[in-house]
Amino acid sequence: MRSLVISKDEINQVVKKYDKNKITICTIGSHSALHVFRGAYDEGFRRCAICAKGREVPYQRYKSAEEFIMVDKFSDVNDEKIQQQLRDMNAVIVPHGSFVAYVGLDRIENDFLVPMIGNRNILRWEAERDRVTKLFEAANIRKPMKINGPDKIDRACMVKFPGARGGRGYFVTDSPAGFDEKMKLMINKGWLTEEDRAKAHIEEYVAGDIYCMHYFYSPLTKTVELLGMDRRHEANIDGLVRIPAKDQIEAGLQPTYVVTGNFPIVARESLLDQAFGMGDRLAEVAEKMVPPGLLGAFCIQTMCTDNLEFVAFEISARQDGGTNTFMNGSPYSYLLYGDGMSMGRRYSREVKNALAADRLEDILT
């Protein structure tokens, strides 16, 4: 009888049975899958898209895969029949935000016995902000001050909630009464529940520009690559700021922070030392605290203040949605690889390099 938590040895046993000449790159058709599939094609791999019925159109229209697995809902990927189908095609899963949200952390850790690129055991850390804080503190990365409960709010604060929500339900407030008022508003919208109240993560609001930094850590070369940066389009806050302040007050509109899209950004060159330092230190401490660490893509979401200092507020311990901004490469990936290196393609390049070195097990969990 197997243990509750999927072990590295179990994954290695699956990988040993794979036909290494017929590896298939696979992920859920959502979030940031398009460049995963295109990157796999560019690196010469077969592709499989797992699509929820009714959500397959983009992946069919862009000819994203040779094979499609259609499911009623994404969580059906946990069914043993589908898992066996994936293993039979020598599938390697690329995890992203929708994969984590829909498949579920418990199932990924305990039931989903298909090899994935990256560390399945660190995915829970990105969802639990106290664990993120531990990583930031160990890596000496500045973070916003945490406020210990709604009754302690005495300044402008950002209120967030765990999980890959795309900013849905986040809000800014400066008082306990404001917290209660906005919680009620979000509950009425159906974005939060009463149970979420106890899960609220409250931190000081840091004014600055958003920089989401996209890294790739290769366990084969022990190097961290900075491949791109982005910032987010958020509704309705980005629309509200176009309204004159007087009209905003009169309209009485409440800002929300739902991510609707992303656009690329380039930092001033003098800031890159900080960017590399944060990525290097985070990868180093993650390997010690949550072995084998941050394998593959990860993202540090930051604000850059007017003192030209990055303050980190979240991480993604897998491919982040902002990687969609460089499907054909970014200015930073161009410096390393020339044209056409998306994060999705970088995953497939890592698989190709691991196969050539007979080290596929080293990049999978």
UniProtKB/Swiss-Prot annotation:
Keywords: ATP-binding, Ligase, Magnesium, Manganese, Metal-binding, Nucleotide-binding, Purine biosynthesis. It comes from the Archaea. Its EC number is 6.3.4.23. NCBIfam families: PRK13278.1-5 (NF009780). This is 5-formaminoimidazole-4-carboxamide-1-(beta)-D-ribofuranosyl 5'-monophosphate synthetase. ATP binds at residues 150-212, 234. The keyword 4Fe-4S does not apply. The gene is purP. The keyword Electron transport does not apply. Pfam families: DUF1246 (PF06849), DUF1297 (PF06973). GO terms for biological process: 'de novo' IMP biosynthetic process. PANTHER family: 5-FORMAMINOIMIDAZOLE-4-CARBOXAMIDE-1-(BETA)-D-RIBOFURANOSYL 5'-MONOPHOSPHATE SYNTHETASE, 5-FORMAMINOIMIDAZOLE-4-CARBOXAMIDE-1-(BETA)-D-RIBOFURANOSYL 5'-MONOPHOSPHATE SYNTHETASE-RELATED. 5-amino-1-(5-phospho-beta-D-ribosyl)imidazole-4-carboxamide binds at residues 31, 98, 262. GO terms for molecular function: ATP binding; ligase activity, forming carbon-nitrogen bonds; magnesium ion binding. InterPro entries: ATP_grasp_subdomain_1, IMP_biosynth_PurP, IMP_biosynth_PurP_C, IMP_biosynth_PurP_N, PreATP-grasp_dom_sf. Residues 120-352 form the ATP-grasp domain. Its cofactor is Mg(2+); Mn(2+). Binds 1 Mg(2+) or Mn(2+) ion per subunit. Catalyzes the ATP- and formate-dependent formylation of 5-aminoimidazole-4-carboxamide-1-beta-d-ribofuranosyl 5'-monophosphate (AICAR) to 5-formaminoimidazole-4-carboxamide-1-beta-d-ribofuranosyl 5'-monophosphate (FAICAR) in the absence of folates. Mg(2+) binds at residues 301, 314. Belongs to the phosphohexose mutase family. It catalyses: 5-amino-1-(5-phospho-beta-D-ribosyl)imidazole-4-carboxamide + formate + ATP = 5-formamido-1-(5-phospho-D-ribosyl)imidazole-4-carboxamide + ADP + phosphate. Pathway: Purine metabolism; IMP biosynthesis via de novo pathway; 5-formamido-1-(5-phospho-D-ribosyl)imidazole-4-carboxamide from 5-amino-1-(5-phospho-D-ribosyl)imidazole-4-carboxamide (formate route): step 1/1.
